[in-house]
Amino acid sequence: MSKNFEWVTPDSDLLERESTKVQPPKLYNVVLNNDDYTPMDFVIEVLERFFSHDIDKATQIMLKIHYEGKAICGTYSAEIAETKVAQVTMYSRENEHPLLCTMEQA
């Protein structure tokens, strides 16, 4: 009892299915940059609080920031990366630290 239906519109005889490929979202790295004023303990706190790193991983990233000038804290979709940058920047300013948090395409 299977019935096949054809959808007809006034302008065309038959609607056709159009195959579309969904692209995965572009990913962005959230980066913390070194400065001479933000304490190392504060950077570790930020990494634990906003990026869910454990103390060991947060310490490794903090040392990379200190010695190499910057380090990737996490990779996210654009909206999440923007939110992380805004949260870290706001938290840093509230605590009177000039910590620079940016995002760049992965």
From Swiss-Prot:
It comes from the Bacteria. Coiled coil: none annotated. Signal peptide: none annotated. One of its GO terms (biological process) is protein catabolic process. HAMAP family: ClpS. Binds to the N-terminal domain of the chaperone ClpA. Involved in the modulation of the specificity of the ClpAP-mediated ATP-dependent protein degradation. NCBIfam families: PRK00033.1-3, PRK00033.1-5. Belongs to the ClpS family. This is ATP-dependent Clp protease adapter protein ClpS. The lineage of its organism: Bacteria, Pseudomonadati, Pseudomonadota, Gammaproteobacteria, Vibrionales. The gene is clpS.
